[in-house]
């Protein structure tokens, strides 16, 4: 996992068809794991970007919970979509738990608004 400055999100590392390590950005649960695990504190300069990703209805936000993959991603809701759009209750619990934690003190109004 790494921070991608251009995408303003945490991205993944994978092995490509040539068995070389490459960085890939598919905004989804992987992008919010540092927030979900408490590794991204309330004073982190990256917290606002993560909260924006969670709260954007064109990305992860939905009427029913946080999507596992961004609605904008080319793989969203395609083929075998086990990780490509469904909403997972355990991840949504962690989002709520960490929104509560991050609401104090620095992102009080923004985090509470989500």
Q: Would you name each region that the model predicts?
A:
Residues 33-43, 93-108:
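Well-ordered alpha-helical scaffold segments within catalytic/enzyme domains
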């Amino acid at each position: 996992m790494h921070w991608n400055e251009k995408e303003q999100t945490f991205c993944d590392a994978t092995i490509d068809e040539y068995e070389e390590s490459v960085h890939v950005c598919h905004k989804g649960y992987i992008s919010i794991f540092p927030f979900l695990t408490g590794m991204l504190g309330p004073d982190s300069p990256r917290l606002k970007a993560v909260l924006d990703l969670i709260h954007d209805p064109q990305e992860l936000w939905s009427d029913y919970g946080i999507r596992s993959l961004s609605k904008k991603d080319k793989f969203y809701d395609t083929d075998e979509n086990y990780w490509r759009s469904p909403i997972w209750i355990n991840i949504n619990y962690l989002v709520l738990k960490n929104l509560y934690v991050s609401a104090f003190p620095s992102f009080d109004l923004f985090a509470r608004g989500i």
